[in-house]
Amino acid sequence: MHGPTSKAISRNVRSVKRPRRAPRPVVSTQAMNKLSNVTLSAEQEKLRERVLSFMRSNLSQYKSDWKHPAMFVIQGDAGTGKSVILNSLFNEIQKLSQFSPSSEDILHGTHNYLVVNHPEMLKLYIRISDSFKYISKSSLERPTSLINNLQKRKVMADVVIVDEAHLLATSKDAFKRFYGENHLKDLMSLCKVLVLVYDDKQALRMGSYWDEGSNNGATLKDFYNEIPPKSRDWYTLKQQFRVAAPQNVLNWIDQISVAGKIPPIESVLSKGNADCADDKIKNFDFKIWDDCGAMYEAIKEKDRQYGQCRMLSTYDFPYRLDGKDYYVECGDNFKVRWDRYTPREVTPWSERCDTIDEVGSVYTIQGFDLNYAGVILGRSIGYDAANDCIKLRPELYDDRAGFTKKKNIHNAEDVKQKIIMNSINVLLTRGVRGLYVYAYDPELRERLLRPSKK
């Protein structure tokens, strides 16, 4: 039997009056709740008000012949609540820009943007905007898009807030349609007030390399010092909100991922925090494993119990964006595929049920929390027996794009080492309830588990 002709179908479609589609409900995720439904601490609330006061003061004094915007930097290690403050701050200034108790408020009628150079984080902010009536999706941008947009329209923003400013490009990237020399430099020419959240220990690529301790890439303080003292401010957050671990575990993470030293195993397995009043800290689950397959089984069990427990690895196993599956292999009993590239996926990788069958990279998990993180220290991370410390082997690190040399990288080998250390730091600071660690290198694995000599 033949169906109706295409013309008949066309007429039928036009003749039917379709009902208006109902708004899509906002499905809340843990990542959304942790960023938007959080009561600020006393320090965070005080900082938010300090930034608001800074904005008002500098907007009211702004003159068109100024060469630089006012700049407020919020620095802090991973997990210190930087993005939580930004989300609250941006919601407040957007509310004041549209509906202010006083039309004389300098923020009334302002045009403001929140920028993040991280696709997963941008998707999260866009989803959160559905729950905040004052935040429009058009005010949330990747830096290149905003720069190109403002330059094309020849307009200036009032306030630009940058989350994860350590991911801003520090060199030209024609592939991503950025033709300037530095994202921050261009943003500084396109706004009156700039607020940056920053942690140079999370810079992961030579093309967006920020380092306050060398002449490689870019240094935020160089830009900051160009601004007159009255138009700049810098605040450092120190309280850890994500990793609810005792201080000895936090020290272990810092020693491994920043100093490259190997603390005694007893220092993290001791019960020195038994008297801690905070049960979350007292019960933080830390373990170094000698069997990656067994660690994975434990992570799956924790995922059934708590959810959001995942395997992670340094970028030490091959991966290409060619549509094929690539695998992380450790020993005889662990072969799990890398996370698949899914740009259309709305739910964060850490919260999708299917990703328990994957290993996440530093790019997948940066900016997000897990309840338990099972971290594989891959092939590029070995052991220097002579000096009893971490030994890095950059030639085994497989992030080719991350190691693409730029003209402002003067000591490429030093930068490669720092990028690997930064990636370790990002991975080790994801777990809220627990951290499991496995070292691919057998000598390092044995050393991490070895008791100190008495």
Curated annotation (Swiss-Prot):
Tell me one Pfam family matched here: SLFN-g3_helicase
- Location of this chain's protein in the cell: Cytoplasm; Nucleus
Q: Which UniProt keywords apply?
A: Cytoplasm, Nucleus
User: Which regions span the lipid bilayer?
Assistant: none
Tell me the SUPFAM superfamilies matching this sequence: P-loop containing nucleoside triphosphate hydrolases
Region Disordered: start-end pairs: 1-25
Q: Which GO terms describe its cellular component?
A: cytoplasm; nucleus
Could you name the domain of life of the organism this protein comes from? Eukaryota
- Composition-biased stretches (Basic residues): 14-23
Other remarks? Present with 1130 molecules/cell in log phase SD medium.
- Name this polypeptide is given: Uncharacterized protein YPL245W
Organism, scientific name: Saccharomyces cerevisiae (strain ATCC 204508 / S288c)
Classification lineage: Eukaryota, Fungi, Dikarya, Ascomycota, Saccharomycotina
